[in-house]
Amino acid sequence: MVKRDFIRNIILALLAIVIFILLGIFVFSTFEIHKEAENAYLKNGDLVTIRRNIKPKYKDFVVYRVDDKDYVSRVIASAGQSATSMDDILYINNQVVDEPYIEKTKNDFLTTSPMGSLFTEDFNITTISKGNNKVIPSGKYLLLNDNRQNKNDSREFGLID
């Protein structure tokens, strides 16, 4: 009886380990926030859990890879949408978008910068896609950092898969 319980417990433990490993490979992963990716919500050194193989939504943070380096940015627009930033105002489908999540960083930047400085340089989907698109194509996303002075996002890399 004791031997059977011991074997059952070993099998259950091994099964739990295998399930945990499979979840880590296919469903969840962890990511450490680095200095360039920090913002009002994510700080340098924070360890976050990310879900794999899901379709991100507007305002979600996503981890993506470009040239074997990982980056964290926020989803601003997705397939079928147009996006323009002009004079520090973001427009999605020609509608002004409120971005309260960047206000503190933006205000800090503007109070320490020369008059007339822009927190977000002007762009649109045509400039980001090098003239190829006016709206975001299927399967692509416009990703921006909350700290818009850090241009390691769609403005540098183009639209992200």
Annotate each predicted stretch with a short phrase:
Residues 2, 6-11, 40-161:
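Soluble "head" domains of membrane/secretory-pathway proteins
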Residues 9-26:
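Hydrophobic membrane-insertion alpha-helices, especially the h-region
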Residues 21-39:
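Aromatic-capped interface at the extracytoplasmic side
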